[in-house]
Amino acid sequence: MSNLAEVMPAMPMQAPATTAPSSNGVFQVTNFNEAINAASFLSGSSLVPTDYRRWVPVKNQYGKAMTNADGTPQLMENPNATSNCLIALNMANRMGYDPLMIMQNLYIIEGRPAWSSQFIIAAINACGKFDPLQFEIVNEGEKEIEYVNSYWENGKKLSNQATVKLENLTCIAWTTDKKGNRLQSDKISMEMAVKEGWYQKNGSKWQTMAGQMLRYRAAAFFGRIYAPEILMGIYSADEVRDFVDVTPETAPQQAAQPKQQQIPCYD
């Protein structure tokens, strides 16, 4: 492989108007072959997340890494590593960010790319179009909320009406633009979280970290309306998890494959 500086020459310091320029490690390639070489180089790094690594640990059915007889970890090749790195590198060049930062904040969930919520907030704050995001939290008091409860029985998906009583917190993400105009997201509420099925999912952080989840969701809603060029049509990791069927039918476990990156729900 040629010298890294030749493979990925530094991008000029003038970044796109919608993003903040990075002062270290932003790379740009000039043709497809250079991009492939750069992606291959990045996939060999131990600093990139699992989805982008050429070699990943083999795990048993309990999620524990397996080892060889000599104690070294068992590894298997990830066939998607180079292509994932290539996509991340392309997005980094388009957005004016360092590829490693994109990889650390772009997750693959159920086959879909998703931004970390912290990255969405940071990108909005750094884009230069607005003042830093603010969050307005209001407690509307205890409320009994009806929702549709779905479940599987004899291979069929059924549903019934159920209720849950909770403190109905609401959140609006807002800021002002350079002209002083107030811009705000739609109101996100715990009632919405229940009715949309986010709250009652197994392991849902809406039950234990309501304030944080409200802020994350409000920021994502704000970004899609007022800064779509930053999100590029990609949802937050929290949203993608919540969009997955709340009650999927269980299926037999298949042979071990390279697993998608496992990340906590409060990213």
Segments from the language model and where they lie:
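Glycine-rich anion-binding surface patch
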Residues: 2-267
